[in-house]
């Protein structure tokens, strides 16, 4: 028999573990560490917003069903008025069900009451989760497009500033022919312009919805519901689907982000090379009080550009993972889910951070025209 003191001890231990896990779950904002997370993008990928987007899909489906007479209109109104969720409560239920969407629906039902029987009618989990993730990818792309457009303008402004600043062009790392520093920056601007077009296309590719039920046959839901929900949420219904939206879309999205990250790394690497002591034709802004080394106080290191180079490697790795997700068993499996929970937030948070960071670097970039002229003379004017 369990002694009286032992029971109380075990009860306290269990309660402490559950409370700690609840706290960790509530505090979990994104997979990317806070150091590289900007607030707007971080909120977009928060647990709270993910469930809110899923709820938006469910409510839009109920509204559409009510409009078509498939559920009572009063029920749809009641669902929209009362439907809410609690992140802690969802996690508490999930610890029993081991199914996040069922946990979510159970929590919503606790708030809605009798009319909750109409929520999720004819749908499968992937209908709401895939559609919600597509909205989040679309919104993330909008943030990144805004970042890139601002970066493009900074590059154009500085390209004009240095349009008459001669410097030596280098091929194979060796002096080649004279050019202008403005031309170098204009080249970067042109590549960012292409990246903007790529992201716009990637945004369109993932701006889709799927509400066709298990294995995508519409066996328990009218195809009109999908059309109506898509219109409400600003998404296009996919032409064909299995139980999931096909992952070539997600792969193209993540791969596009990796290409843009590589463009940023290309620019950052050039700044790093130009900042080398041997060249020092340009360098990152060094703020008052900034230090370069704990052992060598003379150091002025291109740490921000180095950070961008490192983070580009992460996104290229994420692109490989996204392509691995294209292959699923038969009409679906769930092997993609654990990958996407990490790479979709990480990739977009990473790119948002790096684009903003590099925009600031180029905006404040210190350029030394006299050193450029000096270096041109090292080859005797050839």
Where are these regions (language model features)?
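A glycine-biased, small/acidic residue-tolerant capping/turn segment at secondary-structure junctions
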Residues: 73-76, 279-286, 359-373
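Extreme N-terminal basic, low-complexity initiation segments
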Residues: 2-10
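Glycine-rich cofactor/substrate-binding loops
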Residues: 28-53, 93-97, 114, 296-382
